[in-house]
Amino acid sequence: MSQQTEPDDDAALDGDEPGAYGKDERLRSREVTEGPERAPHRAMFRAMGYDDEDLSSPLIGVPNPAADITPCNVHLDDVAESALEGIDEAGGMPIEFGTITISDAISMGTEGMKASLISREVIADSVELVSFGERMDALVTVAGCDKNLPGMMMAAIRTDLPSVFLYGGSIMPGQHEGRDVTIVQVFEGVGAYAQGEMSGDELDDLERNACPGAGSCGGMFTANTMASLSEALGLAPLGSASPPAENHERYAVARRAGELAVEVVEEDRHPSDILTRTSFENAIALQTAMGGSTNAVLHLLALAAEAGIDLDIEDFDAISRRTPKIADLQPGGDRVMNDLHEIGGVPVVIRRLMEADLFDGSQLTVTGRTIEEELAHLESEHGLPTDDEIDADFLYPVDDPKEAEGAIKILTGNLAPDGAVLKVTGDDEFYHEGPARVFENEEDAMKYVQEGHIESGDVIVIRNEGPEGGPGMREMLGVTAAVVGAGHEDDVALLTDGRFSGGTRGPMIGHIAPEAFVGGPIGALEDGDHITVDIPDRTIEVDLSDSELERRLDERDDPEPAYTNGVVAKYGSLFGSAANGAVTNPGLHNDQH
């Protein structure tokens, strides 16, 4: 807010009536700041230190999910403060308000993980409610942990207020036995310890050193994926995703976001002016070229639905087939977001794709410049290194990529008529046949793995974990990491109607739709059924006839909801299919299953 000043007794007399500050007619905050009938409203603002100058300025909300529950968000008060200062200095009226967060890592492997995807919806709903109720003119949406990012972007799109997306930045890598590590190595260490491949002392050292400070998980996991895609979509300035959480550049990015929020109000630029079908295709191309999280499939579908843009799960596969994987970060590789930042950040990847005609640089961004213009601006004004100046063993030329196709694969077949999602972190030609080992929940599967029962060739099936059936579509990094830690990264497949963490690696296939709860074929599987996973052909099949699948489904008892009251029950009853983004906004419910 502006510097506190002594009240000017003549201020109201300068206009025709109290509260006549000559505000912009376009600003809906006029409804609460202007006119004699709004004197009580202004009195409330004055109680918080706002002055006449503030009340004549655009009211810019800064939703902030700061919390001590996760290192992803523990520093966000400082990030938000820099944004507030930027708004104030640029002539806006900054108003910070809170919203929730869930720590995916801390809730992982517990019943509490069912809250994770629900939190995406609660964040979007809460930001919409506050900005609607308080008649805000614009937003700077601050985000840290995984579901913060799509939740904030959904709110910006749904309200269509001039908005700037602001990521809190990622954590630096930890050090263990002379190598960089992240939280994912700790999860995998649990599996290695259970199999006797890691000592208790080694696991303890890994636990104590993997996470050295504030910031979101460091690899190309869900938070860093969605932050990168915010640049591709145009909702955040180019170069804003990669500065680490505890780096001074992160706070410069935050201050600039605040200044930019005032600009987008003045220039009347809205998310609907920025987002197009092509901007979503750009985001998918970047996701698959960087080996981004499978969660981004779910979130991009939800964002497109909010924007009223036709996007289908098969679009991800079509774009992945034509887009090579050129960045090799964790979990597929060894490097983290900070390594990418040191060579120029997300813009250097976008530039390579754009120069190969795999990314459309003509799309508008929040700055008012196109992607192509933004790249030129970064090169000329901010020292973005040229391609010739980049020497990095984890960033590949488009004509000599890490993999000829992108990392995201959409599989279909009689087990997943509406699709399933896989991120390839290893063999692009993976083909697997084996017997089903069927579990009705994640906990039973985890126990099976930790007790050493899995064998080479197995296909672990975890069902009743979908958006409605879970409810909440839990991530399963615990069990997938345990499989990898037990030495079965390449010879055991895992299928589920739930989700995976962005840190998952190996042949783990999620988002199977329809889910078991609504009668999907995964609900018909029995132990020993022969399953084939064929990545080159993009198929996932069980060796059963359609009539046998139908018979089994007809004979099964209709499932009962896992929860009948409370927030989990409420959102569980609202979720749509994973194949359409698992949205809960009733205006977007066209198919539901």
UniProtKB/Swiss-Prot annotation:
Transmembrane segments: none annotated. The modification N6-carboxylysine is found at residue 147. Binds 1 [2Fe-2S] cluster per subunit. This cluster acts as a Lewis acid cofactor. SUPFAM superfamilies: IlvD/EDD N-terminal domain-like, LeuD/IlvD-like. It catalyses: (2R)-2,3-dihydroxy-3-methylbutanoate = 3-methyl-2-oxobutanoate + H2O; (2R,3R)-2,3-dihydroxy-3-methylpentanoate = (S)-3-methyl-2-oxopentanoate + H2O. Belongs to the IlvD/Edd family. HAMAP family: IlvD (MF_00012). Residues 1-40 are annotated as: Disordered. Its EC number is 4.2.1.9. Residues 1-17 have a biased composition (Acidic residues). Residues 22-40 have a biased composition (Basic and acidic residues). This is Dihydroxy-acid dehydratase. Keywords: 2Fe-2S, Amino-acid biosynthesis, Branched-chain amino acid biosynthesis, Iron, Iron-sulfur, Lyase, Magnesium, Metal-binding.
